[in-house]
Design a protein with these regions (language model features):
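Contiguous, well-folded functional domains in the mature portion of proteins
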Residues: 1-111, 119-315
Length: 315
């Protein structure tokens, strides 16, 4: 098995850090060994495995894992919407809400993950924000990008969207991959203001979306279960916000109302237990990603940043 670490650039600290991987030995064995490969294709990628583990995380006894997890990963309990002692299960802790103001929304004079203001002026509306806490890869031109996880592998947009005509509209556009780890805040939000339509479910497997797995096969991203929501923005045009289920995360819950206008930074939904991923697609010429995201992504480094921070500006 390989011991290659996962490194990322921490935007706030301005340093490169090494990721502390939850369940690292299990993930590496599953994706980097012959024995693990047999288990992966026989059980781990299938919904029953994730269902069983998710079921266990809904047991009341699972609440005993909450405080040790907080301590081990040094989570900031001051930003939680309620006391960690009040979570009845580990899953309830996992998809926890945050206090208003815990995630300021870029381009808003006030606002938070819980309640962004309805409008912020013309300049603020031109700023898009990161849809989730996590490690982000920003590709300004998807058609020109190759090997961002492994050399020689290209992102198959038509397979990912499950719609060749829709893929053609985003060809040559920009893509953001936001990878959430189990230690992260697991609610996802709208990166732009606009009107979302009903999400479309594309069923699939539940492979890991860790770089440990994606360095082996990028196509796990379009083999996994996912949901695609189109958001019509008056500034950014049509934006596709896509949530991907992963090992131990078969449950993707949407909390927004289709057809109702949403504010930038407004909650869209949540993942239940595990690691997971959000992919955001923009049509060509509609956004210019921030330079730091593009620079580090080109170097093969994900950028750790939080929901509500700047993603880029309208093109």
């Amino acid at each position: 098995m390989s011991a290659e670490p996962i490194r990322y650039f921490h935007r706030a600290k301005q340093v490169v850090e090494t990721e502390k991987i939850y369940g690292e030995n299990w993930v590496r064995w599953t994706y980097e060994s012959k024995g693990g490969s047999l288990l992966l294709h026989g059980l781990a990628k299938r919904h029953i495995a994730s269902w069983y583990y998710g079921w266990r995380m809904n047991w009341r006894a699972s609440a005993n894992k909450v405080l040790p997890f907080i301590v081990e990963y040094d989570l900031d309990v001051d930003e939680f919407a309620k006391s960690p002692f009040l979570f009845k299960t580990f899953n309830e802790f996992f998809y926890r809400a945050l206090k208003p103001g815990a995630r300021p929304i870029a381009g808003h004079s006030t606002g938070s993950a819980g309640s962004p203001p309805a409008g912020s002026g013309q300049d603020g509306d031109r700023i898009a924000v990161l849809p989730a806490d996590g490690r982000h890869l920003a590709l300004q031109n998807l058609d020109a990008a190759a090997g961002f996880y492994v050399k020689g592998q290209r992102f198959d947009l038509a397979s990912f969207l499950g719609d060749a005509a829709l893929a053609a509209k985003f060809a040559g556009g920009a893509m953001l991959i936001s990878r959430l780890c189990p230690v992260d805040y697991h609610r996802f939000h709208f990166p732009v203001a606009g009107t979302p339509v009903k999400p479309r479910l594309i069923n699939g497997f539940l492979y890991s979306v860790s770089p440990i797995a994606l360095r082996r096969k990028l196509d796990y991203l379009w083999q996994n279960k996912r949901m695609v929501t189109l958001v019509q923005s008056p500034v950014f045009g049509s934006v596709a916000v896509c949530e991907i289920g992963a090992t131990m995360v078969g449950s993707i819950f949407q909390t927004f109302i289709p057809g109702r206008a949403v504010a930038k930074g407004e909650e869209k939904g949540l993942f239940k237990f595990g690691g997971s991923c959000v992919i955001t697609l923009f049509q060509p010429g509609k956004i210019k990603f921030d330079a730091d995201l593009v620079k580090h992504s080109a170097e093969g480094l994900e950028v750790y940043a939080r929901m509500g921070e700047r993603l880029g500006v309208a093109g």
